[in-house]
Amino acid sequence: MSFTDFQTYIHALESAGELHRTDVEIDPNLELTEVSIRALREGKPALLVERPKGSQYPLVINHFSSSYRTELAFGRHPDDIGHELIHFLERAMPPTLQFLLNNKPTIKRFLNARPKTVSTGISQQIVESPNLDALPIQFCWPLDGGRFITYGQIFTYDPRDGKRNIGTYRMHVFDKETTGMHWQIQKGGGFHYFQAQKLGQDFELAVALGTSPALTFATIAALPEGIDEAMFAGFLQNKRVEFLKGKSISLSVPANAEFILEGVVPATERRMEGPFGDHFGHYSAASEFPVFHLKAITHRKHPIYPAIVVGKPPMEDKFLGDATQQMLAPLAKLIHKEITDLWAYYEAGFHNLLVVAIEQRYQKEAMKAALGLMGTDQLSLTKCIVTVSSGVNVRDFDAVLKEIRENYDPHYDFVMIPKVPLDTLDFTSYKMNLGSKMIIDATKKPQRRSSDEQGNNDLRQRDTGDLRSFLRGIDRRITDINIIDNALLLVKIDAPIQYYTSSPEIISALKPNAGKEILKKLLQLPELSHLTLIAIVSEDVDIHNQENYIWGVFTRFDCERDVLFSEQKLIGISPVYNGVMGIDATWKPGYQEPLTMPESIIKKVDEKWGKIWKK
């Protein structure tokens, strides 16, 4: 079944037993976040809150927070969509009559990719003056800078040629008529705004709240720059996306949204935006961003406000991100024929860890592919790429560690790239939008024996308790360890966590932190020389839970500052690494605080929990 508007999908969820309605009042100020997180952890259905505190409009949350719900949204598994796309495109050049006859359903989908202009639509059934206070906008985390619209789909048009872009960006509500516009680097809307600034023009745009599932997924998909997300949505839902002229702006807006916010972003105005509890599991710091001025709100009759909460994984964005990469990952083969699969780990916030399977046809082709991906659209924001041989399950972190253990030699297979663009949300380099990246090539090399063949498996036979006692004798700050497949030693330490050091100058003047001190000791121990990786983490990371330790390691280090080897030197201007690779993934002075919910809010939700889910 195709869904061309939001409420049709919501009703389908309810019919399938995947949505629960509650008339219990829930406060969008913090309470909704706790309810959303707890419901996801307990496997509850999506929740339609009929009486959000302070608003007449109902809201829905967790409507994509399971694999079943994403399949329901498209009528099939996202993997199947990706396979259909790549199968069609690989055989379409040159097209033959037999090809066209055999692929009529897919051709119809491509014809339906063309957006359509209509004269009326449900999104303009009601026209109102600007008043964001009427909407049940969330205050997600206790240290957030204010209320944030979290599911806004921003429709922008290039002022030079009119090409459309749709992206999902958070919007910090300053008052009833203005918000921040959090355009991170490498985002299409930000590129359009850049062109408007060059022309000295104020920049009109529209924000849709609550669209069809296909348009929602297309909006967050990492499509190549210049590809219209509305066309991809039309392909996904097999029906053309409809647009109509805005009421207060000259642009086209979606015809079938729950709400449309119309307005303008001045070319030169900036305002402090944030902090905001983001999907890396920490607060992103306040910084200056453009300002959106609301001119009009239109909506359908009896609209439902869409809400989402992001934070420490797993959250609802796990299912959104996984579904979009399942659909789009096969397309990487069109550009890089050597790539057979790739997977970005939601546990690491997606951009911090990408694993790529390579069919290597010549030496170092895997490294070539990794460097190419680091220069490709939104994949250019990836911090760590691990390459493995074709056939390895890139979605299985244990399988990836096995390949690293057997095939990775840092002398030949490690590349660190300093001083390059980095995800805006990454705080580990202390410089917004700048940092470092690294590549680990763990593909099989026919000319080398694997570490297992060389007999480097001593630690498999060693009792973890004995090793823990031995390492605590080296440094009493070590509280726990976990050895994973003889490849990765996770070490938890008890050391003070300092947040919000005031300036980079103070940070650089501080002595090395405990994590780096302990890491240097461990890297020199002969007893650990057969390991491949050592990672030091802080007390808040559960090193026996894979989801948690992937998050705790990959969101908390800068490659240039925090990666060490047991042997490293310069030969000419070339860095040479050997031995065990160490990562200091502890919290460091200047890092932002991790996301936690106050006990008072947890207790409030405890009191309501049974009533919320009462049938």
Residues covered by each model-derived region:
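Extended, highly charged
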Residues: 1-276, 281-615
